[in-house]
Amino acid sequence: MTAAHADLQAEFLEMPEGLRIDRPDVADGSALWRIAKDSKTLDLNSSYSYLLWCRDFAGTTAVARAADGTPVGFITAYVRPERPHTLLVWQVAVDAAYRGRGLAARMLDGLTARVTDEYGVTGIETTISPGNTASERLFTSYAQRHGADLEREVLFEAGLFPDAPHDPEVLYRIGPLSH
């Protein structure tokens, strides 16, 4: 880990108001499911899938916790098997009571600092439905903060989704990230 990444991780692991970012525990799965459900913007996965995320992908997932340890936000992500230097960010959500504080950006910065060191990640990908301006701003500003290129292309057309109507999913590809 470089000194710059250590400083970045320290800055984002402990935050004002007693908030902190760390890895999830399996016991956090139900809280992540609730936060996703309450977001009203994410495609809600089964409660079982959030338990699996917290068990199998804890190394590439971040949870923001209130001072009492309660999860108040999360990012689920995984390293793509066919592109082992690419982190795919699956979902980003922050509890309504904690929005507007830059928590999503801090989680994304902290998580990517960790995975670039631990997994050798050099780029991130995510998909965003058109009109999800909060996610568009989050990932566009991330690329700008890190001096990385940002490319966009439609990954999945609307017609591919069996549960119509569904907007197309636009792939955001950000990189290269510096180690």
From Swiss-Prot:
<protein>
    <recommendedName>
        <fullName>L-2,4-diaminobutyric acid acetyltransferase</fullName>
        <ecNumber>2.3.1.178</ecNumber>
    </recommendedName>
</protein>
<keyword id="KW-0012">Acyltransferase</keyword>
<comment type="pathway">
    <text>Amine and polyamine biosynthesis; ectoine biosynthesis; L-ectoine from L-aspartate 4-semialdehyde: step 2/3.</text>
</comment>
<dbReference type="InterPro" id="IPR000182">
    <property type="entry name" value="GNAT_dom"/>
</dbReference>
<dbReference type="InterPro" id="IPR016181">
    <property type="entry name" value="Acyl_CoA_acyltransferase"/>
</dbReference>
<dbReference type="GO" id="GO:0019491">
    <property type="term" value="P:ectoine biosynthetic process"/>
</dbReference>
<dbReference type="GO" id="GO:0033816">
    <property type="term" value="F:diaminobutyrate acetyltransferase activity"/>
</dbReference>
<comment type="similarity">
    <text>Belongs to the acetyltransferase family. EctA subfamily.</text>
</comment>
<feature type="domain" description="N-acetyltransferase">
    <location>
        <begin position="19"/>
        <end position="174"/>
    </location>
</feature>
<keyword id="KW-0808">Transferase</keyword>
<dbReference type="Pfam" id="PF00583">
    <property type="entry name" value="Acetyltransf_1"/>
</dbReference>
<dbReference type="InterPro" id="IPR012772">
    <property type="entry name" value="Ectoine_EctA"/>
</dbReference>
